[in-house]
Swiss-Prot record:
Keywords: Acetylation, Coiled coil, Phosphoprotein. Pfam families: TPD52. The modification Phosphothreonine is found at T177, T187. The gene is Tpd52l2. This is Tumor protein D54. Forms a homodimer or heterodimer with other members of the family. Interacts with MAL2. The modification N-acetylmethionine is found at M1. It comes from Mus musculus (Mouse). Belongs to the TPD52 family.
Length: 220
């Protein structure tokens, strides 16, 4: 029996032979850390792609560093020119909105919405609904106009009556007819009052009064 197939019994005197043999075997680091070849690619193609990936990642890092330097320089220029952050924000928003408007998705969405709007406005249901709403609006406007005219006319009549009444009272009192009527009423009143004051002298004596005098002491 060779050393590779020895008994691994812990009580065996040869228990350390296998481990010592495995420790002495050299191991290739490239074989251990190497990933399997991607399906559909040869080993040469994989190496080429990995080299290109490393190059692109290095370029990205360089571009980020350049971009950071450019942004710092841009901020310094804006600070020296006195440009505010609010103005920069407005400019960025305007630029972003312009980019959205010229984007393919926005253009397609606008065209689609335009087509839907045209289809809806040309449909019979939309036309009937629009006519119904238009008629209802006209009737409502006419009713409000009629009510407003009636209220205005009523207020005008009340105002005219009040003005005529306030104007006609002094004129009526100063008219000759009204004065003549007042004179007649005053004459009748004076006659009635004067007759009451002189009533005892003008009244005729009662029959049987004559010269008869009442006795001083009437018998009981």
């Amino acid at each position: 029996m060779d050393s590779a197939s020895q008994d691994i019994n812990l009580n065996s005197p040869n228990k350390g032979v296998l481990s010592d043999f495995m420790t002495d075997v050299p191991v290739d680091p490239g074989v251990v850390h190497r990933t399997p070849v991607v399906e559909g690619l040869t080993e040469g193609e994989e190496e080429e792609l990995r080299a290109e990936l490393a190059k692109v990642e290095e370029e990205i890092v360089t571009l980020r560093q350049v971009l950071a330097a450019k942004e710092r320089h841009c901020g310094e220029l804006k600070r020296r020119l006195g440009l505010s952050t609010l103005g920069e924000l407005k400019q960025n928003l305007s630029r972003s909105w312009h980019d959205v408007q010229v984007s393919t998705a926005y253009v397609k969405t606008s065209e689609k919405l335009g087509e839907w709007n045209e289809k809806v406005t040309q449909s019979d249901l939309y036309k009937k609904t629009q006519e119904t709403l238009s008629q209802a609006g006209q009737k409502t406007s006419a009713a409000l106009s009629t009510m407003g005219s009636a209220i205005s006319r009523k207020l005008g009549d009340m105002s005219s009556y009040s003005i005529r009444h306030s104007i006609s009272m002094p004129v009526m009192r100063n008219s000759a007819t009204f004065k003549s009527f007042e004179d007649r009423v005053g004459t009748i009143k004076s006659k009635v009052v004067g007759g009451r004051e002189n009533g005892s002298d003008n009244l005729p004596p009662s029959p049987g009064s004559g010269d008869q005098t009442l006795p001083d002491h009437a018998p009981f």
